[in-house]
Design a protein with these regions (language model features):
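Hydrophobic transmembrane alpha-helical segments in integral membrane proteins
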Residues: 1-22
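A generic, lipid-embedded transmembrane alpha helix
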Residues: 42-67
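Membrane-interface helix-boundary motifs at transmembrane edges
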Residues: 32-45, 69-73, 102-112, 166-177
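Central hydrophobic cores of alpha-helical transmembrane segments
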Residues: 48, 175-187
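Membrane-proximal helix-loop-helix units in multi-pass membrane proteins
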Residues: 83-153
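Alpha-helical transmembrane segments of polytopic membrane proteins
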Residues: 12-16, 74-87, 146-159
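Juxtamembrane boundary at the C-terminal end of a transmembrane helix
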Residues: 138, 187-196
């Protein structure tokens, strides 16, 4: 077993906790909505935003596996950056659905009031994600076909630009289109991801 793998296994514990907390927060909020004694007015965009938070959280779990042999995983500052990134991921999850349901909830109104905060966090996450991607690909970029680099750069551009637009836009059509685009890009990115 290499030193990188041992370091990765050591670091994985805290990452697993942060990922688990993020998913548990969404599950708890969704459970409260389902069991609320007061009326809940459902909204597809709010639910799609929560689903997107789950997808990028699970995606990060797969990405962790991809960096398990990177030498820089053993460095304190990279670990700190990764913890900060997972903290932002938790904030995304925690802000995706309301916590209080006792007085009734209108998810459309919740999303309208919350979308700027939620998508700003997603933007921060994606900028950090791209920066880490550049860090990890930097040493092998000369061995990657130019077409693949262009595809990755395009994907990264969408992952940063779309949440910026969603944070600023009020139009529900733009939100449906933006969320659909984000799902398409993320699913395309992870389509061949395997933990083995």
């Amino acid at each position: 077993m290499t030193p990188e793998i041992r370091a990765f296994e050591f670091a994985l514990g805290l990452f697993a906790v942060l990922i688990g907390l993020a998913i548990a927060d969404i599950a708890t909020s969704f459970h409260r909505l389902l069991r609320s004694p007061a009326r809940v007015h459902w909204d597809p965009i709010a639910l799609l935003a929560a689903a997107f938070a789950i997808v990028i959280t699970v995606g990060m779990w797969f990405d962790l596996w991809g960096i398990r042999q990177a030498t820089s995983v053993r460095h304190f500052f990279l670990y700190l950056v990764l913890v900060a990134l997972f903290f932002v991921l938790f904030l995304i999850a925690a802000s995706s659905l309301p916590d209080e349901t006792s007085d009734g909830v209108d998810l459309r109104d919740f999303y309208r009031r919350n979308h700027r905060y939620f998508w700003s966090l997603v933007t921060l996450f994606e900028i950090s994600y791209v920066a880490l991607g550049i860090h990890f690909l930097g040493s092998v970029v000369d061995r990657i076909p130019r077409v693949q680099i262009a595809l990755v750069a395009g994907q990264w551009a969408v992952l940063i630009a779309a949440p910026v637009v969603l944070a600023l836009a009020r139009s529900r059509r733009i939100h449906y289109a933006g969320v659909t685009l984000l799902f398409a890009v993320v699913f395309w990115h992870y389509a061949n991801a395997v933990i083995n």
